[in-house]
Amino acid sequence: GDIYIGVVGPVRTGKSTFIRRFMELVALPQMSDTKQAEIRDQLPLSGSGKIITTAETKFIPKEAVPITLGEDQQVKIRLIDSVGFLVKGASGQTEDGKERMVKTPWFEQAIPFREAARIGTQKVIQEHSTIGIVVTTDGSFGELPRDNFSEAEEKAIQELKKQQKPFIVLVNSQMPYKDAALKTAEEIQQKYKVTALTVNCDQLRKEDIARILEKVLY
C-alpha cells in the first residue's frame, strides 16, 4: 500500500533537506530521466542560517512513488513537507512587521504563519500520514542554539502522540556520532518515551533511510 510520511517539527531543523536527500537516494534512482527531472522540480529548497524556507505544506512528489525497502519489499511512498513550529530567533515569519501570511491546502485564504504550523502539523499527521518523522536538532549547525528548539519540538512530539500514529524523532546534527548529539537524542527518548536517532540530514545515506523506516514501520 501507499505509505505517507509526514515530516514535522520546529522550523530550521533540516526537514526539507531530509526530504530532498530521501528522494535523491531512494526514489529518483528508480525512475526514468524525464520522471527524475519532473520530481526534482518538486523537491523542496533548503535554506541556511535563520531564515525559514518552507512556507507552505507540500506533498512530494505529487504522486506516490514506488521504492524498494530492504531485500525485496516494495512500497509506494510520498512525503509531506510541513511548515514547522516557530522557534525563537528564526526569521521569515514576519513581513513588513506583521506576521507572515501563508498558503495551506486546507483553506482558500492565507492564514498566519503560527496558525499554519499548528494546523498544518495536525492535518498532516491526522489526515494524511501513515507514519510521522519529527526532525529536530542539537543546534550544531545554523545559528540558533539547541534551547531555542525545545518548545517547538515538544509541540510536534505531543501532537504525534495524540494522533497515535507510529513515529520517530531524528536529531539532525553536523556530528551525529559526537556526545552532544547522542546526549540530545537520549534526553528526548527519556523525556517523551520515544525512539530518537541522530543523523546528518545533509549527508544521509541509503542505509540510514532504511534504518529509519524499519524503526518506524516494524
Question: PLM features: residue spans?
Answer:
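Charged helix-capping and loop-helix junction motifs
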Residues: 148-154
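Loop/turn-to-beta-strand initiation segments
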Residues: 75-78, 130-131, 166
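Fold-independent oxyanion-binding glycine-rich loops
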Residues: 80-83, 136-139, 173
